[in-house]
């Protein structure tokens, strides 16, 4: 990913870095205010992340990082891929980009005032369209890849909840079949679906849920923790029944198992972060009999431990798969380690520097293990992670 920005453009963009550091969130707030004057544009965004401010801070941080690296945008390649995948999930299309450009440049002018000269705005317009064109091109490739597969679709598709499976005190799985009776595009183990809940009386509410079953052309399974409040998880747990219709876009995401497994694999999860790991384990059990796999999971206790019996069954089917669970509230009769997963334990009980690590869990869990694994000598290219929510900074930072 190389850009041919002129030295003058680079100088102008970098001159705004101190101002973006100070006023970035104000600029993004003003940008969204302009965008959301159009209800059709507003509906594209996850309004929960708007209300709690996480998306505003995330985008402000991303724009600041872009400005700081305007002379070397290649360092943002992984972020570009994640954004493109997310845009496909949220059904964002090329025709939406001009609206963002107008709102962003207008917000920069409004907040920075006279500092935002015509030259500065022209430089930021050039920088915006460079990234926008990269995203549009990548999103087109992702969509084409989906549509060329049997069962592929674009936009929103209606699915029927065909089964509810209680997994723990707070976690339930939902089996989903397409209402139209057609096939579904097989996902890559680790990917997620994006749901909208307009029909449930929550317009603008969108959520990403990992697929927790192995790839197939018949159905998807999602496994959802009941969170506090009245959002999407509350609707699924308290109101959605067998026969309820929910809508989603096709599977996306850059966190998935490779088609060829060349190194030992360590799957590391905390809480409901186990969901993509179960999908990966099902895929490994089905298609990779010689893969060396260590699954390490942490949760509070037996009552919060979801899908334990299913995971044990998968391990029993695969001669090279091991699973260890840590309970922070372990009782004497529990078949689990006590306390928290540690780097020292992983170093002593897994291939460590020789392995590919796949991580999913709460933000503190991810931040700790991404940082500590790399700090302990695991190459960064062997540490893969999934996080749901705006990525306001790299986990290793």
UniProtKB/Swiss-Prot annotation:
Keyword Iron assigned to the entry: answer is yes
Locate the Globin domain: which residues? 4-140
Q: Which SUPFAM superfamilies match?
A: Ferredoxin reductase-like, C-terminal NADP-linked domain (SSF52343), Globin-like (SSF46458), Riboflavin synthase domain-like (SSF63380)
Q: What class of enzyme is it?
A: oxidoreductase
GO terms (BP aspect): cellular response to nitrosative stress; nitric oxide catabolic process; response to toxic substance
Where are the residues marked Influences the redox potential of the prosthetic heme and FAD groups as a site?
Answer: 86, 386
List residues binding NADP(+). 271-276
Under catalytic activity, the entry for this protein gives: 2 nitric oxide + NADPH + 2 O2 = 2 nitrate + NADP(+) + H(+); 2 nitric oxide + NADH + 2 O2 = 2 nitrate + NAD(+) + H(+)
The family database entries (InterPro entries) matched by this protein are listed as: FAD-bd_FR_type, FNR_nucleotide-bd, Globin, Globin-like_sf, Globin/Proto, Hmp, OxRdtase_FAD/NAD-bd, Riboflavin_synthase-like_b-brl
Q: What is its EC number?
A: 1.14.12.17
Q: Give positions of region: Reductase.
A: 151-397
UniProt key word Metal-binding: yes
**Domain note for this entry?**
Consists of two distinct domains; an N-terminal heme-containing oxygen-binding domain and a C-terminal reductase domain with binding sites for FAD and NAD(P)H.
Its protein name is Flavohemoprotein
């Amino acid at each position: 990913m190389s850009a041919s920005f002129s030295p003058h453009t680079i100088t102008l963009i970098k001159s705004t870095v101190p101002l973006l550091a100070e006023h970035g969130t104000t600029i993004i707030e003003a940008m969204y205010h302009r965008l959301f004057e159009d209800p059709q544009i507003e509906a594209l965004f996850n309004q929960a992340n708007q209300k709690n401010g996480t998306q505003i801070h995330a985008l402000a941080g991303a724009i600041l990082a872009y400005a700081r690296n305007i002379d070397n945008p290649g360092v943002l390649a992984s972020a570009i891929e994640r954004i493109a995948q997310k845009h496909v999930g949220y059904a964002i299309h090329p025709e939406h980009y001009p609206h963002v450009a107008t709102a962003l440049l207008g917000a920069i002018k409004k907040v920075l005032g006279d500092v935002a000269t015509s030259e500065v705005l022209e430089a930021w317009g050039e920088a915006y369209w460079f990234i926008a064109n990269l995203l549009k091109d990548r999103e087109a490739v992702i969509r084409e890849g989906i549509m060329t597969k049997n069962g592929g679709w674009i936009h929103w598709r209606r699915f029927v909840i065909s089964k509810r499976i209680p997994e723990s005190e707070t976690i339930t799985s939902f089996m989903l079949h397409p209402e139209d009776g057609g096939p579904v595009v097989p996902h890559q183990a680790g990917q997620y679906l994006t749901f909208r809940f307009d029909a449930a009386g929550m317009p603008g509410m969108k959520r990403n849920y990992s697929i927790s079953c192995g790839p197939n052309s018949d159905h998807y399974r999602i496994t959802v923790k009941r969170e506090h409040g009245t959002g999407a998880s509350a609707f699924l747990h308290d109101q959605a029944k067998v026969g309820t219709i929910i809508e989603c876009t096709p599977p996306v995401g850059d966190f998935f198992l490779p088609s060829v497994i060349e190194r030992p694999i360590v799957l590391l999860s905390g809480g409901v972060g186990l969901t993509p790991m179960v999908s990966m384990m099902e895929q490994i059990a089905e298609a990779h009999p010689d893969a060396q796999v260590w699954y390490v999971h942490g949760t509070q206790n037996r009552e919060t431990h979801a899908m334990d019996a299913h995971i044990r069954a998968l391990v029993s089917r695969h001669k090279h798969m091991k699973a260890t669970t840590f309970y922070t509230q372990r009782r004497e009769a529990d078949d689990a380690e006590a306390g928290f997963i540690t780097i020292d334990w992983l170093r002593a009980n897994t291939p460590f520097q020789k392995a590919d690590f796949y991580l999913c869990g709460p933000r503190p869990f991810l931040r700790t293990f991404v940082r500590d694994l790399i700090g302990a000598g695991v190459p960064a290219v062997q540490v893969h992670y999934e996080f749901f929510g705006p990525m306001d900074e790299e986990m290793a930072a």
